[in-house]
UniProtKB/Swiss-Prot annotation:
Keywords: ATP-binding, DNA-binding, Meiosis, Nucleotide-binding
Domain of life: Eukaryota
Role this protein plays: Involved in meiotic recombination. Facilitate crossovers between homologs during meiosis.
Gene Ontology CC annotations of this record: DNA repair complex; MutSgamma complex; nuclear chromosome
Quaternary structure, from the entry: Heterooligomer of MSH4 and MSH5.
Family matches, as CDD domains: ABC_MSH4_euk (cd03282)
Protein residues bound to ATP: 557-564
Disulfide bonding pattern of the chain: none
GO biological process: mismatch repair; reciprocal meiotic recombination
Molecular function, one GO term: ATP-dependent DNA damage sensor activity
Gene designation: MSH4
InterPro entries in the record: DNA_mismatch_repair_Msh2, DNA_mismatch_repair_MutS_C, DNA_mismatch_repair_MutS_clamp, DNA_mismatch_repair_MutS_core, DNA_mismatch_repair_MutS_sf, DNA_mmatch_repair_MutS_con_dom, MutS, MutS_con_dom_sf
Protein name as annotated: MutS protein homolog 4
PROSITE patterns: DNA_MISMATCH_REPAIR_2
Amino acid sequence: MALASQLSVTDDSAYGFITTNAEIVSKKRKLAQNDDRFEVVMSVYSPKADSMDVGVSVLKLKTLELTLMSFCDSSTFVRTVNQIQVYEPTSIILPEAQSHSQIEKLKYIIHSNISDKVRERFMKAKVFNAFDGMNSLKLYTDINESTLGQVISNRKLSLAAANACIDYCVSTKMFRVTNKIRLKYCMCENTMLIDTCTVRDLELVDSLSETGTTLYSFLNCCLTKMGMRILRTSILQPSTHENSIILRSESLQELINDEDALISIRSSLKHTCDLEKVFSTFLEPRGLLSQEQEINNIILLKTVLQNTFVIRKSIQNVSSHLLVQVKQILEHENVQHLLAIINEYIRNDCQWANNSTELANQRANAVKSGVNGLLDVSRRIRETLLEEVSELVAKLSEELEIFMEYRFEISRGFFIKIKGNNTDINSLPEVLINRVKKRKTIECTTIELMKQSSRYNDIVSEITTLNSTIIHDMYTSINSYTPILLMVSEAIGTLDLLCSFAYFTSLQKDSYTCPEFAKEVTIMRSLHPILGGNNSNFVANNYSCNHELSRIHVITGANMSGKSVYLRQIAYLVIMAQMGCFVPAEYARMRIFNSLYSRISSDNVDINASSFSKEMSETAVILNDSDGDSLILIDELGRGSSLTDGFSICLAILEDLICKEATVITTTHFRDIAQVLANKSCVVTAHMQTVETNGQLEMKYNLVLGRNDIVGYGIRFAEVSNLLPQELIEDSKVVANILRSRKPVHGDKELKLLSRRRKLVLELYFALNYISKLNCDMNYKMQLLQTLQSKFVEEINITPNTE
């Protein structure tokens, strides 16, 4: 929630030969840079206690936006690391060495999860003080004390972190005492936690290969930098607030239904620059920018504000709540007031300068006539001087019968340029002094031109002084409107994101659907978002999860049968749904998950080189941090150990996850795991369908309930790969057959049948309960009940009663 209160091109000279020196050119070029990286300082604080409470503050020095957050983290500080990944700080402030193990562990984990480019700074513990933090916010924000106290009261950890953050920035002169901060408080409990390993495994924003496609690059149809930033944050931190997700979905549906409006909005967004970067220039203290840059920034701001009217016109007829909010922000009276202030002082025909000549002309002519009488007089004198110089050079050219042009540079004043390769520099008349040969031209001057240069510099200096006063007043006025400007930036970024989702959905060949939200998950004929769109033969799959009946899915199948792809597919669908995006499926009823953990290997045997110790350490994090609101995806659990140990560990981990009531989808080559857990009430066993034809395995890539009965697919895969000698393959087949014939049959058959019957009855109970709550026609309910009855009777009859 933003706490900031809502507040109340040039006339080119006819002579056109003015240039500036290299220093001015280099400063101007800084305006055209497209570098998003600027100083972001993050402060992290955890108290000397056994609790896992953490306070974080993030100060973006370019926009002077301070974000505060506090949350209860896990023992491995997963959420803290996630915030580092989201905000990408350039500096991290931490308490100095402490005797408390919890703080030392926090520092170690942060150090292990940041790049070498991120600076770690350690400050004394007394700087992390909540009382001083509150005083700092009172000093550096325009928010009244009562409002400030209501919003961030009882947020001691984030206040302590904020004090350290501000203290560091002031002491290092990154931040000036005259600056004012825009304050935000981030509610981390309304976002999904995706740990670092999951972000890596799923390739959400960075690809593991140079040519790989990430979810970010796949979904990114944004036209503005603001939209791209919001998209990245939405992927790394999907919302868990159902109403917010639904609001996005409603706006997205409206844009998809109104194609003309979508085209119009995207057309108006095409030429929108990085508003956050533009608006932040007015937060910089005066003196850091040249006057040319200041004028250019004001003209650029004017262009941006004029463009908001175009964007506003394109969304004039929207009706969904989120789009209406965007329109209201763009229609805010302060946007019009600010544009009126700029138009009062700046000429209407001024445009953003693209070269040094335009910058110099802006300095003299950008401010309107009539604003300052002395400035108007000085301008007329300047024009008269330019006319005199032009006449002087023309007369000299006629007398000497030499074609001449004049130029002006701040360091040299007026000078003459004579073109021609054959002109001898020594043969020129004596009136031409300070001669310099430059390639195909000769540059020189005269005594009279030097006098005119002196007069011109004096009058330009006077114009600069008068302009400086006017520009200073304008900067002061604009600075007071910064809160609404930053709101405009966020609103346009949100609009761009929604249009990006709508445009992306309209481009897809496969059907995308708006997900519903409930306690159960039902996804019909879903596709992998990235792979499905590029492959017309991609096989659609279903997924169903009922908390009591099917929250644990154990999937078996041959290598290269699509198990890993299926896990990624489910993860992408969940993330996209909680971003407010449509998903590739015929029907999708989703559950909102508070956290997502995945450990997914690759089906490429050349790069799949995981270690058992790494797998166990990552699995330990999942077991420690997951709960009933977590979605866990584990590929080939226990693959890095021996057969007996791997089987035992895999079974123990799944038993623990069953007790935690988390939603789990795991793949494994331990076929007996599926058999052991098959009669658990919450466990569903399935496999990726593989058909044997003429001794060859054909992958169907279709998820089918039940165990996989095909054996020996590992040997067959080795045989097809031609990596091993045929004699060795044949010996392997013989040994495998001998081992299978010796395998004892474990378990009591009667006990298994009893468990199976009890599970069928339990499934019937929950199915009846679900149908009773359906809001539908009674005839349809009767059809469902009849279908359920016939299916139950069929299943129960083939399962003998042992009681």
